[in-house]
């Protein structure tokens, strides 16, 4: 079984927000976690979270240092994140490796900024 869900944003640890964009409520979790778990627990199964790398005409990265909205799917439940720049397999990876893989599938215009944010988070705990 392979499940595919969408997201509004994903942070550098792999946490997924699929419910709220800024102050605008976009929808409930709608069983996303159930589908994610089903895909991951099925023999040879996978769970994909798919999203465009940017929003607002390319001016806003959807892979972010920290979520602006609530966590819909916890990082421990996330298997694979997919953008138009590739797939980041996160299951079983360290936080540092998750961060590296997510930056690699972010829009190229935002990778340096995300790398700096990741460095700040690692060194300052911010």
Predicted segments, located by residue:
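Conserved phosphate- and dinucleotide-binding cores of soluble alpha/beta proteins
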Residues: 1-126
């Amino acid at each position: 079984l392979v499940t595919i869900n969408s997201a509004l944003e994903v942070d550098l640890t792999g946490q997924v927000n699929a419910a709220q964009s800024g102050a605008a409520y976009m929808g409930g979790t709608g069983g996303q976690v159930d589908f994610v778990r089903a895909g991951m627990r099925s023999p040879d199964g996978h769970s994909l979270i798919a999203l465009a790398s940017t929003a607002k005409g390319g001016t806003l990265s959807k892979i972010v240092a920290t979520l602006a909205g609530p966590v819909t799917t916890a990082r421990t439940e996330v298997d694979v994140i997919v953008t138009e720049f590739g797939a980041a397999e996160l299951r079983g990876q360290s936080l540092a490796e998750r961060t590296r893989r997510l930056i690699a599938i972010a829009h190229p215009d935002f990778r340096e900024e995300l790398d700096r944010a990741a460095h700040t988070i690692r060194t300052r705990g911010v």
